[in-house]
From Swiss-Prot:
It comes from Homo sapiens (Human). Coiled coil: none annotated. Residues 109-135 have a biased composition (Basic residues). Residues 136-148 have a biased composition (Low complexity). This is Proline-rich protein 13. It is found in: Nucleus. Residues 1-148 are annotated as: Disordered. Residues 27-67, 75-93 have a biased composition (Pro residues). PANTHER family: PROLINE-RICH PROTEIN 13, PTHR36287.
């Protein structure tokens, strides 16, 4: 029969549970980090972790992902962009008015911009104040090629 006084102070024919750490004995609380926590045992260090459907070594061959640059999906899919006809430059997919990574500027405009750039730096170097557009000129960065 189970002793109702087990683990309690007082006359006790059975000594408290000393040899088994991890029990719920107030005199001997369970250790903070038991070597094997109660409950489902974790896999040993050498065991594979992760999804059993995909072994830890990875799939034997890489799975192609459709739409990934550099990987054309197999099947009757049309290419994302039709190849340009020979001799015709590819059409810029950006909407008109949007600035792309490389804006093509004609030689006249380039010269004009270089001049303005030099002027701006010179202006900022010599004047301590009026740095931020107190005397702003009406030159905008639109690519309208005016005749100079």
């Amino acid at each position: 029969m189970w002793n109702p006084n087990a683990g309690q102070p007082g006359p006790n024919p059975y000594p408290p549970n000393i040899g088994c750490p991890g029990g719920s004995n107030p005199a001997h609380p369970p250790p903070i980090n038991p070597p094997f926590p109660p409950g489902p045992c974790p896999p040993p260090p050498g065991a594979p972790h992760g999804n059993p459907a995909f072994p830890p070594g990875g799939p034997p061959h890489p799975v192609p992902q459709p739409g990934y640059p550099g990987c054309q999906p197999l099947g009757p899919y049309p290419p994302p962009y039709p190849p340009p006809a020979p001799g015709i430059p590819p059409v810029n997919p950006l909407a008109p008015g949007m600035v792309g990574p490389a804006v093509i500027v004609d030689k006249k405009m380039q010269k004009k911009m270089k001049k303005a750039h030099k002027k701006m730096h010179k202006h900022q170097k010599h004047h301590k104040y009026h740095k931020h557009g107190k005397h702003s000129s009406s030159s905008s960065s639109s690519s309208s090629s005016d005749s100079d």
